[in-house]
């Protein structure tokens, strides 16, 4: 499992979410948006997206859960967590696929934020 968290200022929540929904699947021939959920309560909102892609290194599929939260005009809190790319039964071996998926998302996010 690999985790990335970032606080994002001066971005529109919906615009950033839509760009990530489009760019993450476009970044890999096997990546797909599998599911999503949105919550809103007063000025607070939270969006969760689950992406999945094939890991050539691990020979399996792994997931990335993207969570974005914002309360009113406060900064956006983003969390990205990958899972499922390791091998073995009792301990984690070969998490390279998880780390690579997360690195790709970090790079995409930086490109989007530089626009």
Locate predicted features.
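A conserved amphipathic terminal alpha-helix motif
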Residues: 88-115
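Terminal, regulation- and interaction-focused segments at domain boundaries
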Residues: 1-28
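Generic structural motif
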Residues: 10-13, 53, 71, 83-85
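Positively charged, small/polar-rich N-terminal and surface patches that mediate targeting and assembly
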Residues: 28-29, 79, 84, 115
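Ser/Thr-rich, low-complexity intrinsically disordered terminal regions
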Residues: 21-65, 72
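Conserved active-site and cofactor/substrate-binding residues in soluble primary-metabolism enzymes
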Residues: 11, 15, 61, 96, ...
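Beta-strand/loop substructures that line and gate deep hydrophobic ligand-binding cavities in soluble
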Residues: 58-93
């Amino acid at each position: 499992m690999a985790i990335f968290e970032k606080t994002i200022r001066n971005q529109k929540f919906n615009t950033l979410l839509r760009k990530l929904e489009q760019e993450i699947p476009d970044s890999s021939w096997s990546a797909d948006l599998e599911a999503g959920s949105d919550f809103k309560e007063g000025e607070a909102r939270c969006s969760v997206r689950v992406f999945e892609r094939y890991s050539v290194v691990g020979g399996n599929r792994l997931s990335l859960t993207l969570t974005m939260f914002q309360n009113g005009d406060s900064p956006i809190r983003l969390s990205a967590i990958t899972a499922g790319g390791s091998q073995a039964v009792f301990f984690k071996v070969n998490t390279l696929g998880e780390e690579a998926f997360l690195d790709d998302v970090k790079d995409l996010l930086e490109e989007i934020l530089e626009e």
